[in-house]
Amino acid sequence: MKTIMFYEMAPDGLSKAMAHVDEHKARLKTFYERGVLLMAGPFANPAEGALGIFISKEAAEEFIRDDPFVTNGVVGNWRLVEWNEVLV
């Protein structure tokens, strides 16, 4: 089942993001190329966070576990929501 990952920025997350953005983007690219990340990106106002859509909860959890934005405090909170896609 597809899973949506929601990231919320830490209070000081934007100030930390630039130091880790290249590693974070490389991780996104790797998961996309593996076919387990369908799309991802920040909201129009990056301070509001970001989302990613994964093919499974396990893939999302694997991504989060070692994401530089999570391990370095850019992301303050995250949550996963399993999603029943209707239109394909």
Regions found by a protein language model. Give the residues of each.
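Conserved, structured core segments of small domains
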Residues: 1-88
